[in-house]
Amino acid sequence: MKIVSFTGPKGSGKDTSADILKKEGIADGSISFAGPLKKICQEVFGLHHTLVHDPVLKEKPLKDGEIIITPKLLRKINQIMLDYLDPEEFYYNPNKASVIGLEGVPLRTPREILQVIGTEWIRNRIHPDWHLQAAFSTKALSSLNEDGLYCVTDARFANEYQFLATKFGADFKGFYVERPQAEEQLAQATHDSERKVLEVKAIIPAENIILNDGSLEDLKKKLLGLGLKGNEPTTKTKKGQSKFKFAKAGKYDEGSF
């Protein structure tokens, strides 16, 4: 399996880039670090699928008003979190987390729910790697094409990028999508899940920064020029080497993709 990640601020073109690769038959699909979190929030808070995926609806006030965080609610989340992991692959103790500072906090929009539960609770108090392990567990990957290429568009933190680089080695390629308007908005962002993309940008090679300052067709040409190509497993694989063939792609080609 090959993984291509697109990092960047909100509105930079990450999901659009992944959609282009899928429409062109290069990528088989997407894997989301936030996928398990969104499913949990749908179950616990009764959110419709569209409310946790649509970028506009995420910002809308909750239909029934604000939701107040309680210890009981957080314990319920903890219990469901365990269902997404294989304890032989990854284990943590969810009962050590403190609710101090979160109890009584109001959640007013789907985005606030995802940010507070995903970052303030799970990432900062339970385990920073839970969502990584949940999204890429053996169980989660079992239904995917092992010879396919998949896109990740929500690697917002440095440890997420490093996780992909370590887990997939030569079968991983990370890009930062830069769009002028989005970079301006990023300067005003206050939440870690938005600001931390700059730390990822700092470790991505300069040649892997995609400037998305033109039309959709311009972005498409740049993406197709990267030489990304999936679904071509080689017949022999040596330890530490990629098991895929890769297309040549000028300055973007570093021998891996």
Segments and roles (model prediction):
Residues 6:
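Hydrophobic anchor at the beta1->P-loop junction of P-loop NTPases
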Residues 23-30:
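Post-Walker A helix-loop "phosphate-sensing" segment adjacent to the P-loop in P-loop NTPases
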Residues 35-146:
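ATP-dependent small-molecule kinase phosphotransfer cores
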Residues 9:
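P-loop (Walker A) phosphate-binding loop of NTP-binding proteins
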Residues 129, 134-140, 163-166, 171-247, ...:
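Small-molecule kinase domains that catalyze NTP-dependent phosphoryl transfer to phosphate-bearing small molecules
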Residues 12:
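ATP-binding Walker
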Residues 15:
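Walker A/P-loop
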